[in-house]
A protein has these predicted regions:
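Beta-strand-enriched cores of mature, soluble protein domains
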Residues: 1-139
Length: 139
């Protein structure tokens, strides 16, 4: 990925729900991760829907909240594209937009962040988040 890494997390996929099968398969998925964002520890929870595309890839749209250990919140909305990889795992890449009143996390209000999100066959998740404005500022 390009840009400065500003966050990462590890956790578990939660509930999965089939929303439709025609004309495309559409599923809703929730997850929860122990995460850091701009060096601040917390919990990241989110829900996304994934729809199959004609080539077998996935289009995902989601939203969630990062809660710091001292009670501050950052909401996020994202969209991305996913691919099935080996052994039943899924790999997504996409973009996030954040909103917060937290002073220490206020930088998030003005950036578009790029993410990588992986879910293995057992439901374990891993995420990495990058500040794309860092790259643009140095281009």
């Amino acid at each position: 990925m390009s840009g400065e890494k500003i966050g990462e997390g590890n956790g578990q996929r939660g509930m999965r729900k089939v929303l439709s099968t025609l004309p495309n398969f559409k599923v809703e998925v929730s997850f929860e991760e122990r995460s850091t964002l701009l060096g601040v520890e917390g919990m990241n929870m989110g829900t996304y829907t994934a729809i199959t595309k004609p080539d077998g890839s996935l289009e995902g749209v989601g939203e969630g909240v990062f809660a710091t250990l001292d009670g501050e919140f950052v909401t996020w909305r994202g969209m991305g594209v996913g691919h099935f990889v080996e052994a039943g795992a899924v790999h997504y890449t996409g973009m996030l937009s954040y909103s917060t009143t937290s002073t220490k996390l206020a930088k998030l209000n003005s950036i578009a962040a790029m993410f990588e999100f992986d879910v293995d066959a057992t439901g374990k998740t891993r995420s990495q988040v990058y500040d794309t404005s860092t790259k643009a500022a140095h281009a």
